């Protein structure tokens, strides 16, 4: 899957949110992150 750019917000895409979780740099509601 693709990874979101730094500071971008995840819209719920599984791949993007997994990347967000793994790298901990972008917002993703389903993992409890809400970073701007």
Curated annotation (Swiss-Prot):
Q: Where in the cell is it found?
A: Secreted
* Tissue expression notes: Expressed by the venom gland.
- Cellular component GO terms held in the UniProt record: extracellular region
User: Has keyword Signal?
Assistant: no
Record-linked InterPro entries: Toxin_34
Q: Which UniProt keywords apply?
A: Secreted
A single MF term (Gene Ontology): toxin activity
Main location per UniProt? Answer: secreted
* One Pfam family cited in the UniProt record for this chain: Toxin_34
**Keyword DNA-binding annotated:** no
Q: What does this protein do?
A: Not toxic to mice by intracerebroventricular injection.
The family this protein is said to belong to: Belongs to the neurotoxin 04 (omega-agtx) family. 03 (type II/III omega-agtx) subfamily.
**Know the name of this protein?**
U14-ctenitoxin-Co1b
